């Protein structure tokens, strides 16, 4: 039978990044044990998701600020990339015109 266990102490610390996930393989593995494993895993993941969702909803204001900052940085990076591409295109055209003359 295959068993999955998640360290419950880690679930109590929402900022912990590492989740201890242990899978133990034993000699008898039947389809029934896989179904049990999948159901158990789904329940554990649902529980973890609900805890994380609660943590993120508490930090909603900070998340909005970060989203705006990332959107601004993304637009700035796009503008800079376009400007560099345009400058490179002008340099290439200048080079080709010199070659033609």
Curated annotation (Swiss-Prot):
The membrane spanning regions, by residue number, are 68-90
- Which GO terms of the cellular component aspect does the record hold? membrane
List the membrane topology term(s): Single-pass membrane protein
Q: Which domain of life is it from?
A: Eukaryota
Subcellular location field: Membrane
Which UniProt key words apply to this protein? Membrane, Transmembrane, Transmembrane helix
Q: What is its main location?
A: membrane
| Other facts noted in the record for this chain | Partially overlaps CDC42.
> What name has this protein been given in UniProt?
Putative uncharacterized membrane protein YLR230W
